[in-house]
């Protein structure tokens, strides 16, 4: 049975991965749809503003802090090698670290950086905007599913 500080660590992992999944789900289900409905110049400007304002201590604490929690869960699981839940705990950590945090670094952030380099009212921005929305949203769907799946398998480890 998982108990004590290890239990608390895993519950924190469930909460963190679940909160991140919720934020990503909001972007996938309505924020990006709303932005896509705007004229390209407005959509580009709005998304660039969102990307700048998203880098706050609160968001970074939740997002990067959850990645640290998931890494800690993986390390502690390897050290303790519990009789029950080890597969779920390692899978949950991998899902979040690679499917959410890692994917953010290799898929979403580079697209955000590319969007930041275009001037909102230009033909270049108008041409890039539909591609950005499609690709960014697709990768965000993957991050959403990976984060939610991490929360679920962490919960399964506790059951």
What are the language-model segments listed below?
Residues 3-17, 79-99:
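Interfacial segments of alpha-helical transmembrane regions
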Residues 7-8, 19-64, 110-134:
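Interfacial loop at the N-terminal end of multi-pass membrane proteins
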Residues 31, 47-51, 68-80, 103, ...:
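Membrane-helix exit/interface motif
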Residues 32, 36, 78-85, 109-113, ...:
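Transmembrane helix-loop junctions in multipass membrane proteins, especially transporters and channels
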Residues 63-74, 143-151:
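Core segments of transmembrane alpha-helices
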Residues 74, 92-94, 100, 150, ...:
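Small-residue hotspots
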């Amino acid at each position: 049975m998982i108990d004590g500080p290890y239990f608390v660590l895993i519950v924190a992992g469930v909460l963190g991965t679940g909160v991140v999944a919720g934020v990503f789900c909001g972007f996938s289900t309505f924020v990006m749809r709303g932005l896509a409905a705007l004229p390209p110049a407005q959509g580009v400007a709005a998304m660039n503003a969102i990307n700048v304002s998203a880098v706050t201590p609160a968001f970074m604490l939740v997002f990067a802090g959850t990645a640290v929690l998931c890494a800690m869960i993986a390390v502690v699981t390897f050290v303790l090698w519990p009789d029950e839940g080890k597969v779920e705990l390692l899978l949950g950590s991998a899902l979040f670290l690679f499917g959410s945090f890692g994917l953010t670094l290799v898929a979403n952030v580079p697209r955000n950086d590319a969007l930041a380099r275009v001037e909102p009212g230009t033909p270049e921005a108008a041409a890039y905007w539909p591609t950005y929305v499609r690709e960014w949203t697709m990768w965000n769907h993957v991050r959403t599913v990976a984060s939610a799946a991490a929360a679920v398998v962490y919960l399964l480890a506790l059951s």
